[in-house]
């Protein structure tokens, strides 16, 4: 009779080992939750971070316009923290997927800006895994799923400027550079080419970001100003607070009454749940609209155009603010990629 003792023990040992590993990955008691999405997130974010830092410091100049005039973005090539950036992939690459094995060598890959695609794609998928990990952790704790829904706003905004816009424009060289001055350059060129300031979805995004900041400051100041005193007058309010206590720490009715009389009654919330839903939804929806706007402008469905739209009874043009902005747009348009342009045909 065949002896199956050792085989059975091996299966049991393997099962025990993988059971331990899976239990560790999915444990909600760990100081840092990992989860199934964490298996994807941690290496992707780590690779993107290491590659970004290395490229920001050491990467050689990149032929961003595809005309053999490389642009330097690394610190070792004379840049500082403000002017430095990871330069987008070359216009010669277009929207082709450009991993290192597609180049003739590592030097060519660097020259054509392969690091930009490497950092961006690892970051996008890593951030997507982070969002999935937020849902997974909330699910295991029995929480509602709205945390990952809120995080979807910055994720879709990142996808819009790093992935959708380059695809719509036909080249990753049109993506947003990974640096401070590069970001501002991207914004100016975007305005010049798409008139984003006159796009309704951008206006909604501005309202979402600035409105969210205003509402957050208002909420924080109201809560801090209406804390319930559990101590004597000569002691700090913090002394009477215990972390995790079930009792309320501030009086929402007092805050509601104050703000309702400061503005008007219906400008204030008397329900904590509706208040915090509003605080979350306002900026998230605004940023969703901005991402949608950038994604539509990626395919040249641009902002509204009111240039030369006002004339007097004699048919003479009366310049408006739209015409002034248009003149600024023309100036920015001819200044960027100036060696790749054939002025003035580029403005036709």
UniProtKB/Swiss-Prot annotation:
The D1/D2 heterodimer binds P680, chlorophylls that are the primary electron donor of PSII, and subsequent electron acceptors. It shares a non-heme iron and each subunit binds pheophytin, quinone, additional chlorophylls, carotenoids and lipids. D1 provides most of the ligands for the Mn4-Ca-O5 cluster of the oxygen-evolving complex (OEC). There is also a Cl(-1) ion associated with D1 and D2, which is required for oxygen evolution. The PSII complex binds additional chlorophylls, carotenoids and specific lipids. InterPro entries: D1/D2, Photo_II_D1/D2_sf, Photo_RC_L/M, Photo_RC_L/M_CS, PSII_D1. The record marks 165 as: Tyrosine radical intermediate. It comes from the Eukaryota. Fe cation binds at residues 219, 276. It is found in: Plastid, Chloroplast thylakoid membrane. Chlorophyll a ChlzD1 binds at residue 122. [CaMn4O5] cluster binds at residues 174, 193, 336-337, 346, 348. Keywords: Calcium, Chlorophyll, Chloroplast, Chromophore, Electron transport, Herbicide resistance, Iron, Magnesium, Manganese, Membrane, Metal-binding, Oxidoreductase, Photosynthesis, Photosystem II, Plastid, Thylakoid, Transmembrane, Transmembrane helix, Transport. Chlorophyll a PD1 binds at residue 202. A quinone binds at residues 219, 268-269. It is a multi-pass membrane protein. GO terms for biological process: photosynthetic electron transport in photosystem II; response to herbicide. It catalyses: 2 a plastoquinone + 4 hnu + 2 H2O = 2 a plastoquinol + O2. The chain crosses the membrane at residues 33-50, 122-137, 146-160, 201-222, 278-292. The record marks 194 as: Stabilizes free radical intermediate. 2 of the reaction center chlorophylls (ChlD1 and ChlD2) are entirely coordinated by water. Photosystem II (PSII) is a light-driven water:plastoquinone oxidoreductase that uses light energy to abstract electrons from H(2)O, generating O(2) and a proton gradient subsequently used for ATP formation. It consists of a core antenna complex that captures photons, and an electron transfer chain that converts photonic excitation into a charge separation. The D1/D2 (PsbA/PsbD) reaction center heterodimer binds P680, the primary electron donor of PSII as well as several subsequent electron acceptors. PSII is composed of 1 copy each of membrane proteins PsbA, PsbB, PsbC, PsbD, PsbE, PsbF, PsbH, PsbI, PsbJ, PsbK, PsbL, PsbM, PsbT, PsbX, PsbY, PsbZ, Psb30/Ycf12, at least 3 peripheral proteins of the oxygen-evolving complex and a large number of cofactors. It forms dimeric complexes. This is Photosystem II protein D1. It comes from Heterocapsa rotundata (Dinoflagellate). The gene is psbA.
């Amino acid at each position: 009779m065949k002896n199956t003792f050792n085989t059975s023990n091996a299966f049991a040992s393997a099962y025990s080992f993988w059971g331990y590993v899976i239990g560790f990955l999915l444990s909600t008691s760990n100081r840092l939750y990992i989860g199934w999405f964490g298996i994807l997130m941690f290496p992707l974010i780590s690779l993107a971070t290491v590659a970004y830092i290395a490229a920001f410091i050491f990467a050689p100049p990149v032929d961003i316009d595809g005309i053999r005039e490389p642009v330097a973005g690394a610190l070792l090539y004379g840049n500082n923290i403000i002017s430095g950036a990871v330069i987008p992939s070359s216009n010669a690459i277009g929207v082709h997927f450009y991993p290192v094995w597609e180049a003739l060598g590592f030097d060519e890959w660097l020259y054509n800006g392969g690091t930009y695609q490497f950092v961006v794609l690892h970051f996008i998928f890593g951030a997507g895994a982070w969002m999935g990990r937020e849902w997974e952790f909330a699910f295991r704790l029995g929480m509602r799923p709205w945390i990952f829904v809120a995080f979807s706003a910055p994720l879709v905004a990142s996808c819009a400027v790093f992935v959708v816009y380059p695809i719509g424009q036909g080249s990753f060289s049109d993506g947003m550079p990974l640096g401070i001055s590069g970001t501002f350059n991207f914004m100016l060129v975007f305005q010049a080419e798409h008139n984003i300031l006159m796009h309704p979805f951008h206006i909604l995004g501005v309202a979402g970001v600035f409105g969210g900041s205003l509402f957050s400051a208002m909420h924080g100041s109201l809560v801090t100003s209406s804390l319930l005193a559990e101590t004597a007058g000569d002691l700090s309010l913090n002394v009477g607070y215990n972390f995790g206590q079930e009792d309320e720490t501030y009086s929402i009715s007092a805050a509601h009454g104050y703000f309702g009389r400061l503005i008007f009654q219906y400008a204030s919330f008397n329900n904590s749940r509706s208040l915090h839903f509003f605080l979350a939804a306002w900026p998230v929806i605004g940023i969703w609209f901005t991402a949608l706007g950038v994604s539509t402008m990626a395919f040249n469905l641009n902002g509204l155009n009111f240039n030369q739209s006002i004339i007097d009874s004699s048919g003479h043009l009366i310049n408006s603010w739209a015409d002034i902005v248009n003149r600024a747009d023309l100036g920015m348009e001819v200044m960027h990629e100036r060696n790749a342009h054939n002025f003035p045909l580029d403005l036709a």
